[in-house]
């Protein structure tokens, strides 16, 4: 077993062996022996469950030899599981570029990738040790996985679905769907005290996904939470100078129209100035003030009572990534 390895081989101190995921439900799985660097230096074992229920090694894959000055490959494996695992590990480390390199950009938006990075960073999710990626279905051109994540304590678990597809066996696998519904519900319970509207990712009525940053009542200052989210947005924008985003500031319905218009303008400007400070040029940003004209949720309930939860969801700056 791994314990017989010579002391010259440094193993990852936390988990010398980690499960990558299932290649086929309950029949084939991939594990890794972690060397000195937990992600880039690994020996992989593909295991096959025999008729008697015992597992046998089907294939061993050594880490690639990278010449000095050369960049190591982003994904060691280009099969369905390998691409899914690469995508998740990139998102967990907020490496937007690497995550984007393995998606079908027509099916998975930049906003969704950034939203996933934000959720992972803020809720401190990590892939679960046991069955991190369950194989749900697979064919020659489509495979579905269930990703199992947990918080740092291991006490709270959440899951979400991913689909990868390819045109045929000569084409690369790409992530084509990331279903975050269950993950966003868990995130809202943990981070937002159960307020499901307090989520960084929503559907844009015009199509696609929109990132949302929230503000407290009557304020336009950025919280550390918002600044961390903007750092991820900035890294996304720096990947391509031709990308533009529209910052649209919003308020709730308390206060006069003129006051709210000014407040929403200040909210959009606060976001714009922060992005400028971390190196995003002005040419990539358009700021708009909407005031209270476009609420996400009702400010007042049907019986005329105040709706604080709705007003909270309406105090926001929306970031439309118009790529």
How should each PLM-predicted stretch be described?
Residues 149-159, 165-244:
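Periplasmic peptidoglycan-binding/tethering modules of Gram-negative envelope proteins
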Residues 251-323:
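Periplasmic OmpA-like peptidoglycan-binding domain that tethers envelope proteins to the cell wall
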Residues 26-28, 40-42, 140-144, 157-159, ...:
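Extracytoplasmic
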Residues 81-89, 97, 101, 228-235, ...:
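Solvent-exposed, polar/charged alpha-helical surfaces in well-ordered, non-transmembrane soluble domains
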Residues 3-50, 61-64, 111-161:
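Surface-exposed, charged secondary-structure patches
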Residues 46, 56-60, 146, 161-163, ...:
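Soluble periplasmic/extracytoplasmic beta-strand elements of cell-envelope proteins
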